[in-house]
Amino acid sequence: GDKELVAKETGKENPKVLSAGPEDTVFTYFMDHGSDDIVCVGGEDVSSSQLMAALKTAYEKKLYGKWVWFMEACHSGSMFGALPKDMNIYVITSSDGDHNAKMTNCPPNDVIGKENMATCLAGLWDNFYLDYVEQHPDCTIGEIFDAVHADVAKSSDQNVSEFGDLTFRDFKLSEFFGTLPAPSFRPVKMEKSTTTVPVSEVPKHLAMWRAIRADKSELAEAMKKYQEEVFKNAKKEVVLMKLGRALMNEKAADKAFKTAAETYSVD
């Protein structure tokens, strides 16, 4: 990539750019927040059309040979719906375009060494895929997708998805990811958490558990924070319903608000 141009456009002194060529394999693991057709990058939103334009430029300038993306974000599938199958790019997303991603190992399943971490320790999708790769270091990309898609579906509707050149399914992940440590250095299989929380609800969930775990000296402040999070969610619901009410009748707005995007019909 053009480091000087990126520095000029972003104002960053030493920006990271893709330094690869037509003989190189590239692996990108992206994790941040997302919504319909956007993901957050460095505090700013990047649209699906902007991402597609960047990938097209990289392809035309031969900045890579084969490129694999793993993206963890809500509605991450909405970023790659227009990805051509002939650009030597393959993508796995933690969710499709209609669903939020889920977090896992959240309170009360956030204990490490008998200590409560007071946070969600992993995304549901990346927890499954990293665990699978640890246990199957010689696996193909297709094996990862099939196994993780099935595992995630047991506890979430986020629908792990794949895009791009599906012939990449036959490649071993090690071709992009590198060689993992010897089996004796890899951890034993983790017990999966039964607690999953939509990313958008994590702040409220953490605030609730902070209040639950608070002692007398901390309880008032913890309850205040929890009430603030509950109010934020309630305010967002009311604003969305008022907008829906302005565009359609109240019953239709209520139906739209409560129905999953992939099953909703205006009829």
Named regions from a protein language model:
Residues 1-267:
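Cysteine endopeptidase catalytic domains of the caspase/legumain-like
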